[in-house]
Amino acid sequence: VAFGIDFGTSNSVVALADGDGPPRFASFELLGRSTASFRSLLFFDLDEQRPAEPVVFSAGPAGIEAYLDALGEGRLIQSFKTHLTTASLGRTALGPHALDLDELLALFLGRLREGASAALGAPIERAVLGRPVRFAGSRDDQACARAEARLRRAALAAGLGEVELELEPIAAAYHYEAGLERDELAMIADFGAGTTDFCVMRIGPTHRGRRERSDDVLVTGGVGVAGDNLDAALIEHVVAPALGKGSYYREFGKRLPIPPGYYYKLSRWHQLSFLRGSRTRHELERLAQHAESPAALEALMMIIEDNQGFHLHEAVEATKIALSREPRAAFDYVHEDFEVHAQVERADFEAWIADEVAEIAACLDQTLARAGLEPAAIDRVFMTGGTAFVPAVRREFEARFGSGKLSSGDELSSIAAGLAGRARSWDAAAG
């Protein structure tokens, strides 16, 4: 029984490859609907926590439902995969409990494992787990090694007795390869929420199914710029100004700008929970008393205190997706005490994300250069992940390879399917 686990920054997916057919995906219930996505988040109802008792929490779809039922009370933690490279993060206070990142990861992976085991009707005791080429926030190989070690520890603590790690773009290559009838030299581009990863690989019928594939991989590359960075641009330019960014307050006879740090954390999903604390609340209350636009600061406090990160994320994501289809899109965020509405032009959005797109394109060029290849040598470009559909990103690939060489895969399941297929190959070789 071969399992693949795609632990993503925003969403996680578990696949099972049993027999010779295509992988099956664990399915979960969310608000009465079936989904293969297990949202990468944890929710803690602080009223349910008791000293000397295990921490009470929900994860994935159940975490979303518990969060919605709690009407903003409690602690929502999302995008925690982005913290994997952090050397010292401290502990997260959860009522009488205080958990470090390793413990939070183990809670999430354990609940994912339990839910997927029940959904697939088979206990998950060993699996192939995906990892990016370069973890988000990694500045050197030491940071990447720290992140991988942390991921392995958490997987073992979550009940996975045996774990193999595979690079996510290589897993996407295995998924794409499963449908090929002839060999290709492929460029794989995996666009996640926290990282963008590439690999150049020989794939096809003569390569498929072998356990040892290292000779087929010409090069890998990655950069910690991806979907969350594009979300941050929308927060910075559309949402934050309505919440006081760029405005001023008066104190001690001086006119001073509202500190930008609050808005930076607001725009980074993995840092949003850090704003929920008495110190931040007192600082913002003081600023609001002296602000030229106090209502905007009060709205920012409501988003923080009412734990609105999930709802804000949904509104931003909807606008980003719409901008991939249309030249303009509406941004609509509704709180019970205030609303933020805006029309966003695709041209403006592309100007805001120009630096991020340039970083992705530079990593693509560096990956090709390290392989010693010109774009014309690539037979096919397989792109997976939501950012693959952002027109500004897609144009970079069209300019290098031509639109005829580009193909896209299922943004949700490609990685997990490839990981499960790889697990099946390893099991077959071991058997």
Model regions and ranges:
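Short beta-alpha connecting loops at secondary-structure transitions
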Residues: 25-27, 65, 214-224, 297-301, ...
